[in-house]
């Protein structure tokens, strides 16, 4: 069994310095993979209760709901920073991207 981590792609840890340290530390510690999530856009206002917080508030909105790094660009950068750890996309919102350009980007990712 392998264990992995989620790369911070938004919030206070989503800085180049922090992501580099986290990714390289995970590789040194023997983790098997790093996952990167995908969020193209988050609405400014959500009226329905969010089921994953006690208050029902969607916590991303506390910081303006933006600032998410682009998934495949971050995965490419992680590939450049590491050598052995596997890289995974958690969920990819494919309809928001040109499928041919995305396929080419993914194929080029680990050169």
What are these model-predicted stretches?
Residues 9-10, 91-99:
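Acidic, glycine-rich active-site loops and adjacent beta-strand->loop/helix elements
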Residues 15-21, 95-111:
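Glycine-rich anion/phosphate-binding loops
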């Amino acid at each position: 069994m392998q264990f992995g981590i989620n790369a911070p792609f938004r919030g206070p840890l989503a800085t180049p310095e922090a992501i580099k340290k986290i990714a390289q530390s995970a590789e040194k510690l023997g983790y098997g993979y790093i996952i990167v999530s995908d969020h193209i856009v988050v609405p400014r206002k959500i009226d329905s209760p969010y089921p994953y917080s006690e208050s029902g508030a969607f916590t991303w909105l506390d910081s303006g709901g933006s600032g998410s790094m682009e998934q495949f660009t971050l995965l490419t950068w992680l590939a450049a920073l590491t050598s052995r750890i596997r890289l995974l996309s958690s969920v990819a919102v494919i309809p928001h991207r040109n499928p041919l350009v995305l396929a080419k980007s993914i194929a080029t990712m680990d050169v």
